[in-house]
Design a protein with these regions (language model features):
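Generic N-terminal leader/targeting and pre-domain segments
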Residues: 6-204
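Generic hydrophobic, helix-prone segments enriched in Leu/Val/Ile
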Residues: 8, 12, 16-17, 32, ...
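Extended, domain-scale alpha-helical bundle/helix-rich regions
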Residues: 202-374
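Short strand-loop-strand
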Residues: 339, 343-442, 450-456, 460-470, ...
Length: 546
């Protein structure tokens, strides 16, 4: 045998004959061979594979020595390949779990899940980079991360189910129940994050499994048992559960994917100061129903309280978040924040922290204006350029025909629309949106604040109204009024704003804090002194001008 040869090194083979048979390891003259089966021979080939691994002792994961050898042979320098291989083995461990005692299944799962964390962190770093990856790379990274989190979560839940059912070896893993439940909750957090990255519908069964992990730990009186989740990460089941509930309840559907990631990392850094209780005492922010699990909901005094409800308060997190904001306001990014090596701008982190602090404030924010049901069609234009084409600036860009949406409900400050996913190309949190209701001659401006997907695959879009009317205006640098440097912006007509400020929409990165502008509006000229950058999107900047 060749020096250094690992007889258990494998290549992934997925036999598709209505099911996945799993992974096949084969040794041939001291080399590793990838065996592929033609489609017409898949069923016969499936029988051959089952025969090969029919006995537990024949399976490469059946003994810890061979399982560890496989793990040691996974390439450490290639994060994509490493995670794919670990993911495949974790899937095999679940699919063929009946071949193993549950304590052996858990013994193998632990080091494989630990080994996956390094490539997972690397891929998260690349996926949530300050500069978005290419579409190809985004899809590749998302698929691998989502696949691993899914397989890991399902395998941990399979161990839980077999333990709960009293499978052989169950008694041997009783002491590891806190770690099992915490890692299961960690994998669920990852699945939720990847769903948020695509504004995808969350599988309702995920909430039931979250309830199962928490309930098992609670029944074993180990919610507060200190544990090492992974190397360098200490937590408890209660902390993992509370962090997930606070993060998801505060950010789901109203932050961009990158902001959701930053928010999850901030909550992870806030520590173990969340409190979980069985009764509502006015301090609980979110409630989770263990009997009929659904996404975390805002806790209210008037809600029906029953024994299966768990309330999560965030007094400690709120104070630590306030302390963090003081540093961020000074331009200081604390070293304790773990963004997996990504370098985010302080202002980027501060914006997310500020929104989280607002969401954790008691009493919770209430709707400022009443919302009423209505069915009205309106034309929409997504993005600064398309809105500019439809403004009255007097320029013709050959605007294409506008998309038409139907409003479901409306208020003085915004509206909600439900559209098929296929008609929502380019729509995301913080997208700038032009709108023109039927029968109205001018266009207004809004920004997407909430996105969620329903069971039918439709996208629910919540839009905050910035202005009922936009006016295209030419803008010149007041210090250098050369007409060759003219840029076009959009003036937001805000009828009820008596602040004396003018609000403009401009191209991204057009705001300069020390540059005054000359604006022509109607037959008048105005000197605009920069006041503040209100918000910046992918293709536009909001600017408040005195």
């Amino acid at each position: 045998m060749a020096t250094g040869f690992n007889p258990y090194r494998r290549q992934a083979v997925h036999w598709r004959a209505g099911w996945d048979i799993g992974l096949l390891a084969y040794r041939n003259q001291g080399r590793n061979v990838l065996i592929l089966c033609p489609e017409k021979e898949q069923i016969a080939g499936a029988g051959m594979v089952l025969g090969l691994f029919g006995k537990k002792t024949d399976h490469p994961l059946a003994e810890m020595k061979s399982a560890q050898a496989l793990l040691d042979d996974i390439p450490k320098g290639d994060s994509l390949r490493a995670l794919q291989e670990i993911s495949d083995w974790v899937e095999t461990l679940r699919e063929q779990a009946d071949d193993f005692r549950v304590d052996h299944q858990w013994e193998v799962l632990c080091p494989y899940d630990q080994a996956a964390q390094a490539p997972v962190r690397k891929l998260l770093h690349d996926y949530f980079a300050p500069q978005a990856p290419s579409q190809f790379q985004e899809n590749r990274l998302w698929t691998l991360l989502d696949e691993y989190y899914t397989r890991s979560e399902l395998c941990h839940f399979d161990v839980l189910t077999r333990y709960r059912d009293g499978a052989k070896g169950a008694a041997s893993i009783k002491e590891d129940i806190p770690l099992l439940c915490a890692r299961g909750i960690h994998a669920i957090t990852g699945r939720l994050k990847m769903a948020a990255a695509r504004y995808a519908m969350v599988d309702p069964a995920l909430w039931r499994r979250l309830a199962a992990f928490y309930t098992l730990a609670e029944s074993h009186d180990c919610l507060e048992t200190p544990l090492t989740l992974y190397a360098g990460t200490n937590t408890t089941v209660a902390q993992s559960f509370a962090t997930l509930v606070l993060w998801y309840g505060s950010s789901a559907g109203n932050l961009s994917p990158l902001q959701e990631h930053i928010a999850e990392r901030l909550f992870a850094a806030l520590g173990s100061r969340a409190a979980i209780s069985r009764s509502y005492d006015g301090a609980g922010l979110f409630a989770f129903d263990l009997a009929q699990p659904t996404p975390p909901m805002r806790a209210t005094a008037g809600a029906t309280v029953h024994p299966a409800l768990r309330f999560v308060a965030a007094d400690g997190q709120r104070q630590r978040l306030a302390d963090l904001l003081k540093n961020l306001d000074k331009g200081i990014l604390p070293e304790g924040l773990n963004f997996y090596g990504a370098k985010y701008e302080v202002e980027q982190v501060r914006e997310v922290a500020q929104r989280l602090w607002q969401s954790l404030t008691l009493p919770p924010p209430t709707r400022r204006t009443p919302r009423r049901k209505i069915k009205v069609n309106l034309k929409v234009a997504n993005g600064f350029s398309k809105m500019l084409e439809r403004s009255d600036v007097g320029l013709s860009f050959g605007a294409e025909e506008s998309e038409v949406w139907e409003i479901e409900d409306i208020s003085a400050t915004g509206f909600r629309s439900v559209i098929p996913m296929g008609r929502a190309n380019g729509i995301r949190i913080a997208s700038l949106l032009g709108s023109q209701p039927d029968g109205v001659s001018h266009w207004g401006a809004g920004v997407v604040r909430r996105l969620s997907r329903d069971l039918d695959g439709n996208l629910h879009i919540g839009i905050e109204l910035l202005s009922p009317r936009i006016v295209g205006v030419p803008l010149l640098d007041y210090a250098n009024p050369d007409e060759s440097g003219v840029q076009i912006g959009m003036y937001l007509n805000r009828p009820n704003d008596n602040s004396g400020e003018a609000w403009l929409l401009m191209k991204q990165d057009a705001f300069v804090a020390n540059r005054s502008l000359k604006m022509e509006l109607g037959d008048k000229e105005y000197l605009l002194l920069p006041l503040a950058l209100v918000e910046q999107g992918e293709d536009t900047t909001w600017r408040a001008i005195a």
